[in-house]
Amino acid sequence: MNISLPSEPDEDCLKKPVGISDQFKIPDNQMTASSQHDTGCCKPAYGRLNGDRGDGWCAKEKRNRKDDWLQVDLGTTIEVCAIATQGDINGNEWVTDFKLSYSSDAQNWTPYNDANGEEMVRVTPRYFDASLESY
């Protein structure tokens, strides 16, 4: 299985969202994480774009943890042409960088490397009202 994230995603691909924002396409039990914040408002399944449940997914320790992960089982091999992240709808918290890996068996993971051969995918920090905008 191969994955590629072109610098300019194909328009046809962009018209076919994977469905992570839809809990009926990707059920809650197909979203898992390394940990979650104790309050119960930050479950892995709350890490969906445009979600209205909880505060999004939050790792147990919110600050400076580089080893936490959110995993989504897409159920099949698909083309991924873009990735979007969104901040907490109730506060000023959002992802600043992340690593992307893929697997066909949830055991053996291959890191996605960007055009520079770097494993880390950087998200340009944006300051915005997280309850109104998503990028």
Predicted regions and their residues:
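Residues within well-ordered beta-strands of beta-sheet-rich folds
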Residues: Q71-D73, C81-Q86, S101
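Trp- and acidic/polar-enriched beta-sheet ligand-binding modules for extracellular glycan
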Residues: M1-P6, C42, N64-W69, N90-Y135
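A short beta-strand element within beta-rich, extracytoplasmic domains
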Residues: M31-A33, I78-G91
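Aromatic-residue detector
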Residues: K15, M31, I78, W94-F98, ...
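Disordered, acidic Ser/Thr/Pro-rich linker "stalks" and the adjacent N-terminal cap
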Residues: N2-G75, A115-E118, V123
